[in-house]
């Protein structure tokens, strides 16, 4: 689908469709008022007859409106004007895209960017419209033999900005929005892949393809089990030893700043391509969804794709920690004591708390990069789902400024996160009689004690942890990966690169 921006009055648009908003109760937006005036009150007369109230989700498609060059006008209900917020704006865009796609409008000029969203500028409105449009049109049909597509799908969308001075900002918004949307799509595609296809080797192949596509400044290295053994990554290796699939750690290095002083930001993604729970096996109900336990790695891959596409002037390293947790004669057991790469020992009390055992060695490994900051992304705990539900990602950090940056980026992007504490009192729950620590701390504060566990391996750099167990995928009829938190991390890196969208 093609996107562009222009600045012009509605009566001069010669398009298949013009899209404008209507507020409750039957109040036309400024552009809709212009069209009504041009058409000698044709639109307002329809509203007076009760054709459209302006409630959220309502639509009215008009054909051959008098004195209007475009074939059709699509009126979209936007609710009460004062109540229009970021969430409702995205819902309006989503409804617009679905309606245009379903009614055979192959191109449209969208004036919804005129809507006032408190605290948001035209860059934000255009970018969010692009991201929302791509999200709305996404379908996971790679493995379907019959792919259903509309007969006349939406091909082109033009966003109108109020002045010519804002065209540059609008074009940048489209560029950023498309790159972020492509990163989200890549993360979703990986997340939705079945575990018999998407194993650690598949993740590695995707990482190598990324380097091939952006060979100018992207390098990928894949570290296998023998190298991990030599590095002392015994905790990581233990998790995968029950599987027939080799554990592989893919390291994607993007260099956008050649300065010797430019330290990288490191993103670490948990990549459990299937988590059966191991010997502490999970219930069979819903176990198919454990293919999503690699959504952290999928998100990191999506972000690295966005960074390379936009050629951001910063250095970023993405690590995809690929592994599979299976029961078997060689599987690790409850009661085992593992020696991590850091030298610290861990008593395994539950083999289903495996993500932290993989991440702890990766967090030690990335010390060699002397990072500016490290952010790990993981579907880590069911406790985070209990605490925050499926709407907000859990955030923990050992560095307040980094946490504040991530929270700000989450608010900017709409991919929200909430900070949880990392107090020393929680560390006591990880005590073990037989090792330096246990791999679980009991049910109370389970998301926090998991973060506390990871914090013991991050003392040499600024670090944040994103627990996406509640936000990485949806269940039920809308089942599928969400691509979160690609948008959050993309905004964080755009801010670091100086593109905060506040021009």
UniProtKB/Swiss-Prot annotation:
A GO molecular-function descriptor: manganese ion binding
CDD domains registered for this protein in UniProt: Peptidase_M17
InterPro entries from the UniProt entry: Leucine_aapep/pepB (IPR011356), Macro_dom-like (IPR043472), Peptidase_M17_C (IPR000819), Peptidase_M17_leu_NH2_pept (IPR023042), Peptidase_M17_N (IPR008283)
Keywords: Aminopeptidase, Cytoplasm, Hydrolase, Manganese, Metal-binding, Protease
Enzyme class, spelled out: hydrolase
Cellular localisation: Cytoplasm
Cofactor annotation comment: Binds 2 manganese ions per subunit.
Cofactor(s), by name: Mn(2+)
PROSITE patterns in UniProt: CYTOSOL_AP
Amino acids binding Mn(2+) 2: 270, 275, 293, 354
Pfam family, any one: Peptidase_M17_N
Active-site residues per Swiss-Prot or TrEMBL entry: 282, 356
Entry superkingdom: Bacteria
Family: Belongs to the peptidase M17 family.
PANTHER family the UniProt entry points to: CYTOSOL AMINOPEPTIDASE, LEUCINE AMINOPEPTIDASE-RELATED
NCBIfam families found in the cross-reference section: PRK00913.1-1 (NF002072), PRK00913.1-2 (NF002073), PRK00913.1-4 (NF002074)
Stated role: Presumably involved in the processing and regular turnover of intracellular proteins. Catalyzes the removal of unsubstituted N-terminal amino acids from various peptides.
Protein name in UniProt: Probable cytosol aminopeptidase
Phylogenetic lineage: Bacteria, Pseudomonadati, Pseudomonadota, Gammaproteobacteria, Enterobacterales
């Amino acid at each position: 689908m093609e996107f562009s921006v222009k600045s012009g009055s509605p009566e001069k648009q010669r398009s298949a469709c013009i899209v404008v908003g209507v507020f409750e109760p039957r109040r036309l937006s400024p552009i809709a008022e212009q069209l009504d005036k041009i058409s000698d009150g044709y639109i307002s007369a329809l509203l007076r007859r009760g054709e459209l109230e302006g409630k959220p989700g309502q639509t009215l498609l008009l054909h051959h409106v008098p004195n209007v060059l475009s074939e059709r006008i699509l009126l979209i209900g936007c609710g009460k004007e004062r109540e229009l917020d970021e969430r409702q704006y995205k819902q309006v865009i989503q409804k617009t895209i679905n309606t245009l796609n379903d009614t055979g409008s192959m191109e449209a000029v969208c004036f919804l960017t005129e809507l006032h969203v408190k605290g948001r500028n035209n860059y934000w409105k255009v970018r969010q419209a692009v991201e929302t449009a791509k999200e709305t049109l996404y379908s996971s049909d790679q493995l379907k033999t019959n792919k259903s597509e509309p007969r006349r799908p939406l091909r082109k969308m033009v966003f109108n900005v109020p002045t010519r001075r804002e065209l540059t900002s609008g074009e940048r918004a489209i560029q950023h929005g498309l790159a972020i949307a492509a990163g989200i799509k890549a993360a979703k595609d990986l997340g939705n892949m079945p575990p018999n296809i998407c194993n650690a080797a598949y993740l590695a192949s995707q990482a190598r393809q990324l380097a091939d596509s952006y060979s100018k400044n992207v390098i990928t290295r894949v570290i296998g089990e023998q190298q991990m053994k030599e590095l002392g990554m015994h905790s990581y290796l233990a998790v995968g030893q029950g599987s027939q699939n080799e554990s592989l750690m893919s390291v994607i290095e993007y260099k956008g700043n050649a300065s010797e002083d430019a330290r990288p930001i490191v993103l670490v993604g948990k990549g459990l391509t299937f988590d059966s729970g191991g010997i502490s096996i999970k219930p069979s109900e819903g176990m198919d969804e454990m293919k999503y336990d690699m959504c952290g790695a999928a998100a990191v891959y999506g972000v690295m794709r966005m960074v390379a596409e936009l050629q951001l002037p910063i250095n970023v390293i993405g690590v995809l920690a690929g592994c599979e947790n299976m029961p078997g004669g060689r599987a690790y057991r409850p009661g085992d004591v593992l020696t991590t790469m850091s030298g610290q020992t861990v008593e395994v009390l539950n083999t289903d708390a495996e993500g932290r055992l993989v991440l702890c060695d990766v967090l030690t490994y990335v010390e060699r990069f002397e990072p500016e900051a490290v952010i790990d992304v993981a579907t880590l705990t069911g406790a985070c789902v209990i605490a925050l539900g499926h709407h907000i990602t859990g955030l923990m950090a050992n560095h307040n400024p980094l946490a504040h940056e991530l929270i700000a980026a989450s608010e900017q992007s709409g991919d929200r996160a909430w900070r949880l504490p990392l107090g020393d009192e929680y560390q006591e729950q990880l005590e073990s009689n037989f090792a330096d620590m246990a791999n679980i701390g009991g049910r109370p504060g389970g998301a926090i004690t998991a973060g506390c566990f990871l914090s013991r391996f991050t003392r040499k750099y600024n670090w944040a942890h994103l627990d996406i167990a509640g936000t990485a995928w949806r269940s039920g009829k809308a089942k599928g990966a969400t691509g979160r938190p690609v948008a959050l991390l993309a905004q964080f890196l755009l801010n670091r690169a100086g593109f905060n969208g506040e021009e």
